[in-house]
Amino acid sequence: MIIDITEIMDWIPHRYPFLLVDRVLKIDPNKSITGIKNVTVNEPQFTGHFPARPVMPGVLMVEAMAQLAAILVAKSLGSTKNKEVFLMTIENAKFRRIVQPGDTMHIHAVIDQQRANVWKFSSTVTVEGEIATESKFTAMIKDKT
């Protein structure tokens, strides 16, 4: 099931310039999700990171992984309209390859564990088949107040 950017915006609250998932390529609710982020030179982070050699900040790659996982949570629950997904922990984040404008980040997230409102994930970002980033993280789903 392919989910385009318009539908992604129905599932998570993020918007430009902080929406970091362009398309979902595959989703298996309650299990895993795969999506992409096309990295372009006109993104605001590249004006300062770094002007002479633009590099995608590692923290934004982890954020893209978390946003993709939030889409997986929403699809697994059927909706998150009355809920919010908050990142709780990031563990063992590793950055193995520079990501720069022109690259396509292939993001994959897997649910490792889900207990009540706490979900644990493993995630990777690959570019041209090489691992760029990998991390484990935990998110909490709370009712909106």
UniProtKB/Swiss-Prot annotation:
It comes from the Bacteria. The keyword Lipid biosynthesis applies. Keywords: Cytoplasm, Lipid A biosynthesis, Lipid biosynthesis, Lipid metabolism, Lyase. The active site is at H49. Its main location: cytoplasm. Pfam families: FabA. Involved in unsaturated fatty acids biosynthesis. Catalyzes the dehydration of short chain beta-hydroxyacyl-ACPs and long chain saturated and unsaturated beta-hydroxyacyl-ACPs. This is 3-hydroxyacyl-[acyl-carrier-protein] dehydratase FabZ. GO terms for molecular function: (3R)-hydroxyacyl-[acyl-carrier-protein] dehydratase activity.
